[in-house]
Amino acid sequence: MGHHRPWLHASVLWAGVASLLLPPAMTQQLRGDGLGFRNRNNSTGVAGLSEEASAELRHHLHSPRDHPDENKDVSTENGHHFWSHPDREKEDEDVSKEYGHLLPGHRSQDHKVGDEGVSGEEVFAEHGGQARGHRGHGSEDTEDSAEHRHHLPSHRSHSHQDEDEDEVVSSEHHHHILRHGHRGHDGEDDEGEEEEEEEEEEEEASTEYGHQAHRHRGHGSEEDEDVSDGHHHHGPSHRHQGHEEDDDDDDDDDDDDDDDDVSIEYRHQAHRHQGHGIEEDEDVSDGHHHRDPSHRHRSHEEDDNDDDDVSTEYGHQAHRHQDHRKEEVEAVSGEHHHHVPDHRHQGHRDEEEDEDVSTERWHQGPQHVHHGLVDEEEEEEEITVQFGHYVASHQPRGHKSDEEDFQDEYKTEVPHHHHHRVPREEDEEVSAELGHQAPSHRQSHQDEETGHGQRGSIKEMSHHPPGHTVVKDRSHLRKDDSEEEKEKEEDPGSHEEDDESSEQGEKGTHHGSRDQEDEEDEEEGHGLSLNQEEEEEEDKEEEEEEEDEERREERAEVGAPLSPDHSEEEEEEEEGLEEDEPRFTIIPNPLDRREEAGGASSEEESGEDTGPQDAQEYGNYQPGSLCGYCSFCNRCTECESCHCDEENMGEHCDQCQHCQFCYLCPLVCETVCAPGSYVDYFSSSLYQALADMLETPEP
């Protein structure tokens, strides 16, 4: 490595000069402009470094798709054969100390190589104007931290922009990014290969900038051991390091998806692929168990520390793919115990990121969704237990140990997040086991069910996760309760609440039935009241008819008296009508009703005066006779006991209510309307005649 030092220092100095020459306004413009352009400066040698650095600042390293093999050679050209040189660990420690403290307030520790310390400051100035706000390294990082906070907060990834800057970054970040030490390349590669190498290095930086979205096979056990030390102290700085040889192969595959790589860059390694060793994950677990806000970045023995650091830091690794072993899962479980609520990587959630990271970041439940199906049965069993306690979190875990760790952690840290996003397979299995309804969901929604009958159950099930079948009937809920008897020991309160809710629902139904009965009773009472009203109306009509007949009688009496011949004819007619009487309905005597309604009190007061003789005397009128409507004639006996004058009868004769008609008693009741009198027969015959006239047209 020693013969490459002049190259490194020269490139660093040139990059610093280029960054100083550019004014701040240019850097601000570059923030808006420079995304998405490719670096097409294929110059070679040290002489063109300044031009390349300036072009680097204009064209940020995103999507260099056209040069598939450039990164490989640049990494080896600049002499960063990390896998072939024995001095690599020392430089790793130096650079890790130099650049490992990128957060504001993190003091960069001592640098064994002074030139590298200077290069860190210069490169930071160079990187200051980039659109992503990817911070450089060194002491100036804390000064411009406010400038770059609106860019990826706490993701102070080390940008690698141009070929020259790639060379500079190869020295600065050769422990963060260009760790793809391709063993087959020597530091003495031809300069003719530099063009391809540099642009591919930029491409590699873009994918490495991508927080190792696709972390592939082949991380060794030694790398993992070093990761343990590296991750103990990595904070939100999240160094985005490179990978081994396979990463370059992936870069070739991902040339067409560079923009996707950039989105995946901040996607926090949604897809971490196969082949991570057991020790790597154990070390990662140690690293993440000790994450403090202080994030003191200590020296790293190997570049692999940073590599695993990024993979696990941005890990939350929503989809860590197959062949991860149980120890890896346990280790990363420790990582997420302390890190899940803290890593909210804002501003870089593409649609793909939402799909990949949604289960990871916002639901914080299954960080290990796509593990091998080896432990799928255990996973299902644990899921049933977890759904019994806190189904809202929906934590389909891959392994028992991981699940146990998550239980305590999520009970405390993420109590209020209802994580409904569960993989489809697990959804089906869990829905079958839990009887289509999780108990904890019932607890949360049974209060709504109270007093609403079956509507409460429907509202309740509307909040269930997609794997759970909506239950619409209370009878179905009871079936579910029979299926969930296995979980009564773990969650007895939910079943008790189910019983209470069912009882309350039954009470609601009983109340509904009672209400119906009350309504029916009211209807019946209303029917009775209608009958009474009808009777009252009939009485009123009869009273009106009586008044009309009385007026007619008076007019008849005042008019010409009838001849005896005419009276005889009327009697004959009446006899003939009496024969036909069965055809007619006999009109009840209105005197009886009058006696019942208004004359009861007066009769009682009159005592012996109103005896049965009077009833017989005034009750034997002919049917239909007007005298039958002379209700006052029944009160004539009361007039004897009434000592009031005619002038003031209404005022003083309170007991004699009908005394105002007492003067009519000797004139009408005793003479005209006596039973069997002329008026009695005449009026009855007239009534019958009218009845015949009305009845005959109908047939």
Curated annotation (Swiss-Prot):
Superkingdom to which the source organism belongs: Eukaryota
Keyword annotations of the record: Calcium, Phosphoprotein, Repeat, Sarcoplasmic reticulum, Signal
Cellular localization per UniProt: Sarcoplasmic reticulum lumen
UniProt repeat feature Sequence, residue ranges: 106-121, 134-154, 155-177, 180-213, 214-237, 238-270, 271-294, 295-318, 319-342, 343-365
Stretches with biased composition (Basic and acidic residues): 55-89, 324-335, 444-463, 470-481, 504-515
Region of interest (4 X tandem repeats, acidic), residue spans: 106-365
Modified residues (Phosphothreonine): T76
Protein's name in the database: Sarcoplasmic reticulum histidine-rich calcium-binding protein
Organism: Homo sapiens (Human)
